[in-house]
């Protein structure tokens, strides 16, 4: 039953993203045209590193490192460092990093095994932690005070934005997109108050999905523990 509810919540979020991030459906109280900005009008590129997994560890201190594989598999649209632990670079390697990710920056995975290349995360709640953009990523630093927290993370993972990327994603065994091509895309820019309202709706949907996933995982662990007890004879079924 909970799995069905989870699937339904995920469908609802997808529908909300399709409607709200394109301007097809407007939230109450908002009207007027959205601006369309060229990528270069919105972002400047920051420096990334090329360190592999072997240069990373699960240490809670040190320079955090956003690896493209984690963007593709582990992280959602908005990566809040106050809520999610991410790997660190080994201390001697972390000492070499001079460019850091700030709140509101977008980190894009430029490489994948399929058309998921271009998946992005918006980083929030760094709270003074040093964070680097890692292997096969683009670090995109937006112009200040034009975007509400969460807007770019949700918009740049929407179908409407990803469709712009698809013609430029190239490769045979490995697919990738270049900086030279990603700058040919454009970004939709509603008024900042509307961005904030949309991001809040989608963030609420994310929280509901996350709570259901946690419930499902806890039930699985309980069943697994009970099976172990039954199989070892520690607990016997009453007959």
Functional labels for PLM-detected ranges:
Residues 1-33, 184, 188-239:
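Amphipathic alpha-helical coiled-coil/heptad-repeat segments
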Residues 27-50, 184:
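Non-catalytic DNA-recognition/assembly elements of restriction-modification systems
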Residues 40-57, 70-106:
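Sequence-specific dsDNA recognition surfaces
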Residues 45, 71-74, 114, 146, ...:
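Active-site/binding-pocket entry motifs
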Residues 53, 129-138, 147, 162, ...:
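A short glycine-rich beta-alpha junction/loop motif
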Residues 72-85, 106-133, 150-154, 163-167:
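Short, ligand-facing micro-motifs at secondary-structure edges
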